[in-house]
């Protein structure tokens, strides 16, 4: 399997498309080999799940507020009926300040809507350092394609 030995074809497709939809075998292993090949090629890698993303651009690049879960009886007079808002630092802002390219590997991408997937494509096209790989479910063999081509199907 030359693909798993070098990962060059995958890396070339990732650099040209900026955002890839990938389908991996359910038993796993293929994605970690590809991540190791990307690291060996000079990429920094980060793996995260897309559940709870909200707006992808804000979640990944901007300071944003979240409301922590309600854990029982609390004083609503202090923070209003909606609760307090906590500021959360962005996931990728500091990683993109370095000159090394960054490969963001997103798990469970099938839960994202079409508009969120297109926003990820736009985000990776705006920033030349950022390359995004979104796992879009399982398949019998490893295959990938540009996210925009995947969404056209």
Swiss-Prot record:
It is a peripheral membrane protein. It comes from the Bacteria. The keyword Lyase does not apply. It is an enzyme of class 7 (translocase). InterPro entries: NAD(P)H-quinone_OxRdtase_su_N. GO terms for molecular function: oxidoreductase activity, acting on NAD(P)H, quinone or similar compound as acceptor; quinone binding. GO terms for cellular component: plasma membrane-derived thylakoid membrane. It is found in: Cellular thylakoid membrane. Its main location: membrane. Keywords: Membrane, NAD, NADP, Plastoquinone, Quinone, Thylakoid, Translocase, Transport. It catalyses: a plastoquinone + NADH + (n+1) H(+)(in) = a plastoquinol + NAD(+) + n H(+)(out); a plastoquinone + NADPH + (n+1) H(+)(in) = a plastoquinol + NADP(+) + n H(+)(out). Its EC number is 7.1.1.-. HAMAP family: NDH1_NDH1N. Belongs to the complex I NdhN subunit family. NDH-1 can be composed of about 15 different subunits; different subcomplexes with different compositions have been identified which probably have different functions. NDH-1 shuttles electrons from an unknown electron donor, via FMN and iron-sulfur (Fe-S) centers, to quinones in the respiratory and/or the photosynthetic chain. The immediate electron acceptor for the enzyme in this species is believed to be plastoquinone. Couples the redox reaction to proton translocation, and thus conserves the redox energy in a proton gradient. Cyanobacterial NDH-1 also plays a role in inorganic carbon-concentration. PANTHER family: NAD(P)H-QUINONE OXIDOREDUCTASE SUBUNIT N, CHLOROPLASTIC (PTHR35515:SF1). This is NAD(P)H-quinone oxidoreductase subunit N. It comes from Prochlorococcus marinus (strain MIT 9211). The lineage of its organism: Bacteria, Bacillati, Cyanobacteriota, Cyanophyceae, Synechococcales.
């Amino acid at each position: 399997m030359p693909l798993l030995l070098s990962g060059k074809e995958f890396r070339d497709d990732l650099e040209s498309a900026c955002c890839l939809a990938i389908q991996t075998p359910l038993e796993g292993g293929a994605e970690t080999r590809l991540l190791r090949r990307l690291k060996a090629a000079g990429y920094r890698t980060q793996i995260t799940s897309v559940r709870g993303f909200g707006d992808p651009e804000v979640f990944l690049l901007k300071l944003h507020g979240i409301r922590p879960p309600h854990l029982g009886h609390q004083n609503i007079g202090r923070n209003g009926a909606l609760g307090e808002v906590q500021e959360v630092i962005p996931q990728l802002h500091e990683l993109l300040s370095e000159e090394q390219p960054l490969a963001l590997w997103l798990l469970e991408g099938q839960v994202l809507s079409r508009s969120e997937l297109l926003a990820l494509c736009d985000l990776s096209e705006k920033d030349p350092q950022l390359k995004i790989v979104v796992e879009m479910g399982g398949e019998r063999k490893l295959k990938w394609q540009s996210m925009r081509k995947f969404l056209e199907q």
